Amino acid sequence: MAMGPDVVRIAAVSDIHYSKSSHGALQPLFAQITESADVLILPGDLTDYGLAEEAKVLARDLTTTVKIPVVAVLGNHDYESGQMGEIVKILADAGVKMLDGDTFETHGVGFAGVRGFCGGFGRGALGAWGEPIIKQFVHEAVNEALKLESALARLRSDHRIAILHYAPIRDTVEGEPVEIYPFLGSSRLEEPLSRFEVTAVFHGHAHKGKPEGSTANGIPVYNVSHQVLKACYPDRPAFRLFELRTSSAETDAGVTPIADRRHWGRRSTDRGSTAPQQAQEENPSPS
């Protein structure tokens, strides 16, 4: 089937935890992503200890190797040293689209991103009751959900991609100790996703979770933590690659994971009217 400019390839990997000594560590991975995708998503934990020096190392590797748009949100590790503002500035100056209740559109696809927060899922979610510190904890999750809702509402693209660090559903954190589920995400983040008919959701944070799940309304959710990808797909480079058809006739097609590395090759915007075989849908391995 012909692969024209109405097909966008999205690469995603989270929790890369760049340190001061990480220079060059992921450049081979970034080079393959640049060759294969039209957009790269980085859903948080960009640095290990939340240091500006770590962000500078990542910025150098990205500017040297990645020649496609990069869209990112911060993760909890990026907050560790209180240097979030510096990290955002360093990466933004390097060309990364840093989202925090913001949006970005490219190739006919709209991206909305927030960090998200904790609180748990479903009937096990923490309620705003009791001590002020508990209410403050819950209100942080509520505020992140409201920021996500506001960002999604501003998108005018037919295809909307949500980028989070924390999980919006329980499915993709299964495999982690159940005792820490409340600290891995919040189902409050799920509500805006369904309201605005999001095409797909990408998150990280849960290093021992599952790579795929879905919201109650069937929206696909992908845990693209670097650690999950290495564990679940040991025979592949540690990033996920997806195709999204953006033609008006296929607005409901959603994203299709690409499993067969023979179909990775050049990104769609370079392929013009060439006609490789249609990529096969990926069957997720158990976590």
Where are these regions (language model features)?
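N-terminal active-site segment of His-dependent metallophosphoesterases
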Residues: 1-68, 78-82, 134, 138, ...
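Binuclear metal-dependent phosphoesterase catalytic core
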Residues: 2-7, 105, 179, 187-199, ...
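Active-site-proximal beta-strand elements of phosphoester/diester hydrolases
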Residues: 7-17, 108-120, 161-163, 220-226
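Active-site neighborhood of phospho(di)ester-bond hydrolases with catalytic His/Asp-centered motifs
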Residues: 12-14, 40-45, 70-76, 97-101, ...
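Metal-dependent catalytic neighborhoods of phosphoester/phosphodiester hydrolases
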Residues: 22-26, 46-63, 74, 79-94, ...
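Active-site-proximal segments of metal-dependent phosphoesterases and phosphodiesterases across multiple
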Residues: 59, 126-132, 155-197
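Hydrophobic alpha-helical segments and helix pairs
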Residues: 81-82, 86-119
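Binuclear metal-dependent hydrolase catalytic cores centered on His/Asp/Glu-rich metal-binding motifs
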Residues: 109-157, 182-187, 237, 244
